[in-house]
Amino acid sequence: MKRSNVNTTIASLAIVGLLLAGCAGDDDDAGERTTTADDGLFDDRGRSGDDLVRSDADADVAEQTGDEQTDGGPSVDGSSNDMSAEMAEESAGDTGGGEASSVPAGRDAEGGLFGADEPPPDDADARLEDNTFRDYGYRDFVDADVDPLSTFALDVDTGSYTVMRRWLDEGQLPPPESVRPEEFVNAFDYDYDTPRRGLEISVDGGPSPFDDRTWLVRVGVQGEIVDDEDRGPAALTFVIDTSGSMDRDDRLGLVKDSLSILVDELDDDDTVAIVTYDDSSGIVLEPTEIRDRDRILDAIDDLRPGGSTNLEAGLREGYRLAGESFRRDGINRVVLASDGVANVGVTDPDQLARMIRDDADRGINLVTVGFGMGNFDDVTMEQLADQGDGFYAYVDTEDEAERLFEDELTSTLLTIAKDAKIQVEFDPDVVAAYRLIGFENRGVLDRDFRDDSIDAGELGAGHQVTAIYEVELERGVDVDDRDEVGEVFLRWEDPDDGNVIEIDEYIDLRDIEPDWTDTPEDFQLATVVAVFAEILRDNPYADGIDIGDLADEADRLADEIGGRDVDDLDDLIDRAAGLS
């Protein structure tokens, strides 16, 4: 029987997915269970579930935040069991990256989608060279007997999806290390029940269309929607990169267009301040009420590029100014518009991220908005947003700017949940093993789920978050005999009063449709998006899926659902199929 325990309310997210592999097994030794990729959704013939993928970058994040990633075989995402944590360390595989790397145009010929003998397309654009991404690896199966708990911080970033679109617009596949599946799925809206206040969890599911041995279960968490007129006044500080690297139409030109859209949408009582940085930083505009909109727009229009890139100085000056104009009754945000490159002062992304941690704790949140491609630093932009208690978006077109600053303005500005994290507890009598797709750099120690001092994720009004698990059932389990396979716990802090709220919902097999065609269309959409990401990042678990079959599903969804976003996805998958 489905139950829900709600203590209090406020926030927004949406977790999609859980894959239940049928209890099969031709393993002769019933006492010994080995989870292999070909037992799962993606029908891979690659690594076994005994291989743990853990990146050095994950360890860095865990050390900074107290979080640990769940990437591994019979080990854990955290450690309800110290021995399992040791196993995780000892069994680290070689498919996790962890190092930030400068990525040239195209794919690596060895193992990339171009193939060993195929060069990148002839029209490969030099603008796509020298970008910095971090390979966080991918997660492997976790033995539910060793650790039935999967714990991670929520993440509403969408930058990875838009970065992918930019690469395909240039006629190239994105680098695998640039792909973060959760950010792909976050880029779409799903039809979840909306609570009047707080969060609500819902669960549904169905079989995978790509492997008849597996099932998908969606766990959706939706937060309250706040009308723009009901939000408090906003004090925004724009920190704008005006260095020489921004001297392109898709950089400073698009920054000007984007911030002008934002200013036009703000209320008269809101304020905007502008800090720019190149070799050093400077204040272009002191905090100014939107009533003086023309003055603000003129200041934006007058921006000119030149010089080196002292991101550290820009952030320090921006946060100082934001502190001086802090509104206790309102919204306080720094909006960083940059290509992420830093070559003067502090340049290490992790050091920069730690530098702003205290300001985030004081209630000044950071939104990082990436622009340009070619000499673009995705790592810095994403890490700053994580440590700045905000989110990371990438703007490649004016349409994307309108989505971020016009259509989703209140979500962009108003935080309704702080330090939000999820813990899924699987029943080891039912579930043999599970694998979380994505969130490789958002892991939290299992034992830290109820430690409210641990930094986790922030969500804006109406935001949704999506996660996907692949799950193998224990041999002999009859799905008709068991009502539940696990339980989802969601915990966050109300930013208004500081109260900590926790809700839970059981994963009920009766919520799972037996036929793919009977599942909700938005459930099918989330599945296609997540699988697309797995294919693009060369995850061995996706090797068994033909991208042409995925393109067929996307074509069908574009016809049935329609809308700009789904049509765009359909086109992107078609283009990726043509390049692979």
Predicted regions and their residues:
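Bacterial N-terminal signal peptides that target proteins for export
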Residues: 2-10
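C-terminal motif of bacterial Sec signal peptides marking the signal peptidase cleavage site
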Residues: 19-22
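Exposed acidic/Ser/Thr-rich ligand/metal-binding surfaces
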Residues: 24-29, 199-419, 475-480, 570-580
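Ser/Thr-rich, Pro/Gly/Ala-heavy low-complexity intrinsically disordered linkers and tails
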Residues: 25-104, 108
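Acidic/polar low-complexity segments with low predicted structural confidence
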Residues: 130-215
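Long, acidic serine/threonine- and proline-rich intrinsically disordered regions
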Residues: 143-146, 158-165, 414, 418, ...
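Membrane-embedded beta-barrel scaffold of Gram-negative outer-membrane proteins
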Residues: 425-427
